[in-house]
Amino acid sequence: MRVILYTGKGGVGKTSVAAATAVRCAELGQRTLVISTDAAHSLGDALDREVGENPTEIGANLWAQEVNALRELESHWDRIHVYLSTLFSSQGVNDIVAEEMASPPGMEEVASLMQIRRHKEEGRFDTLIVDCAPTGETLQLLAFPDVARWYLQRLFPASRAVMRVARPVVQPFVSIPLPPDDIFGHVRKLLLDLESMKSILGDPRTCTVRLVLNLEKMVLKEAQRAFTYLSLYDYLTDLVVVNRVLPAEVQDGYFAAWRQIQQRYDASVESLFDPIPIRRSKLFDHEMLGVDRLSELADAVFGEDDPSTTFYRAVAQRVRKVNGQYELTLQLPFVSRDEVDVTHGDGEIYVTVGPYKREISLPRILTGRRVTRARLDEGALHLTFAGSAR
């Protein structure tokens, strides 16, 4: 199943472009589902149809779904949530605060993304288009499987068998409720679900991310940051869509100045996102509502091309041997040396860029070797490792 995630700053037309992509894929005969994981759903508005929390048939080969995040959260987290709430309350935490603390930030959104795993397993659809939340929330969402795994492994470090033996002995001497047996089953299932979802989203052969932007400074800056952080987490960006470009016939009065501003920023888009392909769509003189209008938008963005095509392919990480030393290369566009921090763990390295930190498991050949040099060159971070293990 082909998976395409659309994200961008709020208000750039991301939902319209995602819906237009789905419409065109359906027209090409692909069984296509477009889903919205944004808490403020507008997918139904774009399609000009009522869309439910389960796949709703819109037309030939086309379905739409607005995910109910709370319901998804309950199905994946409810039993663990009950235990954690009890745990925090037992330590004197206010009941309401305990309820909030029992759900790590971003859990609602990641539960929504579990729908991708479900649809992949069911095999009903050829193409899945995901209308994600605005950029910042999407970045947190895509990083969350790593965060959730860390959170769960530290909250529940013991195995079910160990806890079954230890509980009768330990419980009388501690003030916290120890997790019951069934909790470990729920945690294990959730960890497996997170790993499965990450493997789907992180497979560049089938899943890519697309950035939608307008020709404005703040929007471009946010798109650049998104591109950087997506690269940090190994998500492949295969297309940038520049939306709502003022057409050439707009030459007079109020919009003439706006057209000049857009032209100035448009001149830099190619170099900013090179080598990612750029597609453009004009600002239409009518609202893009309903399947027919969205098909018109798809014409503008994709022309005769199949939107499910992967328009750009790249290797996010590469290991090679140079002069007897191993070098690991990571793609990190738009960052300066001062913004990057690299620390070494046991079998992994931690790369921090701005507010985002990623744990990168090292291939076996690099395990036990120390980083001797780090350099940034043409949008890539090069880490040199010692020739022999410590």
Model-derived features: where do they sit?
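Generic beta-strand structural signal
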Residues: 321, 344-345, 376
